[in-house]
Amino acid sequence: MTEQRTIASSATREDEAADASIRPKRLADYLGQQPVRDQMEIYIQAAKARGEAMDHVLIFGPPGLGKTTLSHVIANELGVSLRVTSGPVIEKAGDLAALLTNLQPHDVLFIDEIHRLSPVVEEVLYPAMEDFQIDIMIGDGPAARSIKIDLPPFTLIGATTRAGLLTAPLRDRFGIVQRLEFYSPQELTRIVIRSAAILGIDCTPDGAAEIARRARGTPRIANRLLRRVRDFAQVKAAGHIDLTVAQAAMQMLKVDPEGFDELDRRMLRTIVDHFDGGPVGVESLAASLSEERGTLEDVIEPYLIQQGFLIRTARGRMVTPKAYLHLGLKPPRDSAPAIGEPGDLF
């Protein structure tokens, strides 16, 4: 099993506690994702002008990009309360009914990991989203009867990292669909500078930029790296973070300039050394790395693919010339092209 990685995009308890203190409250403070911000500003203002609940919103994208944060910002901008839950927590239809019946008019209900809702719960959610009504079964056996309960108009915000796992009926009931993209190093630098200021960390712009460029395009990772570099600086540099201190801290953490850690490099080197650069099936690769298939597909691969170090083909995974060069190796003449180069397999 994979231990918690410093550059993992999944949230830890420390992340959740820290995020609460640095989470932006308004769209003006929500850095990056400019197209999403521009659209949501229009939808929010229009809903407020009409005095209506905003349409239901589906937010999807890799973990750590700010889906939960965006839901808080939306509720704050609408001036309503936010109720937060997740798909696995809502086990029965009654659990969902309890949440819905306690909402006030125009409130926002945020369901994280919405793709993990059970079919029974989804069936209750459909009329709630469309008609602001739910049907509840009272009693058992022949005496059971259905009672229709009216709900106040509300906005459902669903978040998922696996949009493809949503059922079509659920997906079609969202009037607003937003995809969050990986952040640029420049955007992450602004986020690191903002977080450092809020947390009272002495960090220079070049130190922030060094942290940002190793954060895999993900604010959650950038903020976590900032906290680890702060620890390093507190012991080794009197609490001051500059370029040199940030680089030394990253070397200690074994996070290279591309944002890769030992597991990323081990995966690339395994494909090169054991499978001649690929293609290799994901099951064989998982066995070689002693990792679960889901860990490879959901945790390790997305960033390697997005950065052009790895490609998926019908025959399996292949590394690109860029991966060979990163490992200090000379690419073979017949190695897979990097994403976007001539001969791209997609």
From Swiss-Prot:
One Gene Ontology biological process: DNA recombination
Chain segments carrying region Disordered: 1-20
Domain of life, per lineage: Bacteria
Reactions mediated catalytically: ATP + H2O = ADP + phosphate + H(+)
One Pfam family of this chain: RuvB_C
CDD domains: AAA
Biased composition (Polar residues): 1-11
UniProt-recorded Gene Ontology molecular function terms: ATP binding; ATP hydrolysis activity; four-way junction DNA binding; four-way junction helicase activity
DNA-binding in keyword set: yes
Entry EC no(s): 3.6.4.-
Catalytic EC class: hydrolase
Main location class: cytoplasm
Head domain (RuvB-H): annotated span: 257-346
UniProt keyword list: ATP-binding, Cytoplasm, DNA damage, DNA recombination, DNA repair, DNA-binding, Hydrolase, Nucleotide-binding
Region Small ATPAse domain (RuvB-S), annotated ranges: 184-254
InterPro entries named in the record: AAA+_ATPase, AAA_lid_4, DNA_helicase_Holl-junc_RuvB, P-loop_NTPase, RuvB-like_N, RuvB_C, WH-like_DNA-bd_sf, WH_DNA-bd_sf
Residues the entry annotates as binding ATP: I22, R23, G64, K67, T68, T69, E130, D131, F132, R173, Y183, R220
Annotated localization: Cytoplasm
Large ATPase domain (RuvB-L): annotated segments: 1-183
Positions bound to Mg(2+): T68
Function (record text): The RuvA-RuvB-RuvC complex processes Holliday junction (HJ) DNA during genetic recombination and DNA repair, while the RuvA-RuvB complex plays an important role in the rescue of blocked DNA replication forks via replication fork reversal (RFR). RuvA specifically binds to HJ cruciform DNA, conferring on it an open structure. The RuvB hexamer acts as an ATP-dependent pump, pulling dsDNA into and through the RuvAB complex. RuvB forms 2 homohexamers on either side of HJ DNA bound by 1 or 2 RuvA tetramers; 4 subunits per hexamer contact DNA at a time.
Cross-referenced NCBIfam families: PRK00080.1, ruvB
Family: Belongs to the RuvB family.
Entry domain remark: Has 3 domains, the large (RuvB-L) and small ATPase (RuvB-S) domains and the C-terminal head (RuvB-H) domain. The head domain binds DNA, while the ATPase domains jointly bind ATP, ADP or are empty depending on the state of the subunit in the translocation cycle. During a single DNA translocation step the structure of each domain remains the same, but their relative positions change.
Protein name: Holliday junction branch migration complex subunit RuvB
The species this protein was found in: Xanthomonas campestris pv. campestris (strain ATCC 33913 / DSM 3586 / NCPPB 528 / LMG 568 / P 25)
Encoding gene, per UniProt annotation: ruvB
